[in-house]
Amino acid sequence: MIKTHNTKIIAVNRKAKFNYQLMETFEAGISLLGTEIKSARSGNVQLRDAFVNIIKNELWLQNTHISPYIMAHSENHNPIRPRKLLLHKREINKLISKTREANMTIIPTKMY
């Protein structure tokens, strides 16, 4: 269950409810770089075209645009680089089996 009373919602994918039939929801962590964290906290995230790709039994978030952090020095992150999702092994196996057997897609709906 997602607790939203103490969390700040960073980004919402509003088109996901209209373009897809949402079957289940999962909560996952995401591996971010330092400048990505600061940019995400300021709300510079786009989830509209994002999806999850399965590579070597790991879940990778693709096409999520996190804008470069303005106050960063010359080294900044790639805005649309793949980002690893962090879940328990049993949750990863469940999602992989569902996507392969029923030809489903994993879509991010909210980032907080």
What kind of region is each of these model predictions?
Residues 1-33:
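Intrinsically disordered, Lys/Arg-rich N-terminal extensions and targeting peptides
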Residues 33, 55-56:
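Structural motif
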Residues 38, 46, 53, 66-69:
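Short, surface-exposed beta-strand-loop junctions and turns on beta-sheet-rich folds
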Residues 50-54, 111:
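A structural signal for short hydrophobic beta-strand segments in well-ordered beta-sheet cores
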Residues 53, 76-86:
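Acidic-enriched and Gly/Ser
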Residues 62-78:
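Short, charge-patterned binding micro-sites
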Residues 86-112:
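Beta-rich strand-turn-strand
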